[in-house]
């Protein structure tokens, strides 16, 4: 049995013009309909809000997508930008990449900007929260995937999520030695970190409205 009548509670809050925040529990590529099937969960991400609490998608005013400054995955499934070298190990260790529920180590790779753009569009994301940018502190170079060298068109890859043989194409950016850790004002970030963020916005087609610079709540830059 349910603890209470959530649908009625939500409608009462709506009628009272209260702000309501819903939080998705999975990554977009684990969505049963839009993800890398069959390596998915049994539920939908954004669509699950309507099914779970009985509100219309038109009632959602703003959707924030959360992405790390690099890409991770737990368990099996295609991962075009996965790193099998020392850099992958470095990201995993510095980022503390262990599955919160399973305890399994996460696979790590460079940020997949192409998939970020694809899933931001399909999920109706209005703004991005970019986390763990501090994990990239101290690297001489950082990369972002902009697309793939594949026999299939990008449209076909998106439609089927057949990413097993996709070879990533990257842009390489200057890294930074000046730390971003703990910074709370965007203007106080170093030039290269700002450039990285701007490239994420350009490639994903979505503004970065929040930036996490550490594990604590106060380690956050709010731009909007």
Predicted segments — roles?
Residues 1-224:
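Non-transmembrane, aqueous-exposed alpha-helical and coiled segments at domain scale
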């Amino acid at each position: 049995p349910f603890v209470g009548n959530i649908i009625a509670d939500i409608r009462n809050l709506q009628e009272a013009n209260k702000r309501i925040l819903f939080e998705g529990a999975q990554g977009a590529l684990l969505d049963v309909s839009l993800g890398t099937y069959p390596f998915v969960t049994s539920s939908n991400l954004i669509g699950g809000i309507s099914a779970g609490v009985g509100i219309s998608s038109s009632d959602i005013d703003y959707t924030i997508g959360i992405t790390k400054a690099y890409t991770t995955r737990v368990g099996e499934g295609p991962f075009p930008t996965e790193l099998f070298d020392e850099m992958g190990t470095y990201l995993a260790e510095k980022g503390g990449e262990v599955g919160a529920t399973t305890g399994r180590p996460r696979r790590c790779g460079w940020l997949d900007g192409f998939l970020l753009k694809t899933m931001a569009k399909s999920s109706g994301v209005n703004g991005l929260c970019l986390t763990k940018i501090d994990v990239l502190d101290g690297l001489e170079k950082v990369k972002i995937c902009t697309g793939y060298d594949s026999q299939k068109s990008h449209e076909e890859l998106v439609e089927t999520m057949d990413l097993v043989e996709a070879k990533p194409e990257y842009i390489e950016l200057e890294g930074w030695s000046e730390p971003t850790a703990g910074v709370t004002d965007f203007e106080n970030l170093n030039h290269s970190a700002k450039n990285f963020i701007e490239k994420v916005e350009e490639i994903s087609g979505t503004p970065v409205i929040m930036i996490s610079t550490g594990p604590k709540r106060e380690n956050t830059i709010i731009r909007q």
